[in-house]
């Protein structure tokens, strides 16, 4: 944990789809996301009639900028959700989706050997989590690892 930024306020979460920055106006930038598109995505998700589901947190791993927990989705529910969301908008994120929970951003540039060495020393323990709701959330881009705010929530089941 001494390699991570200390001021992390962001709640632990699993990002499903990066839509962009919410706006009530016609999009001016590539990462603008209209409220009417959000409303369409909500309708599409409600059509899935999702029941609560289980995910499994597995190993700790590292991106170049962050430490994270892998998420195993045995029934590919996250894939179904992402496919549904992609019907009404183009994601503005990395091409390959890796379900994960970010544990923190690195405070500096660290040698990958050092990071991987530390990860390997950690005990492995898989944990299951129950997903009961989906949240369309947002954050203030000017605040590094600032809070997430809920905009709309869908209760499952």
Q: Where is each model-derived feature located?
A:
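Histidine-dependent nucleotide/RNA phosphoesterase domain, centered on the 2H-phosphoesterase fold
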Residues: 1-157
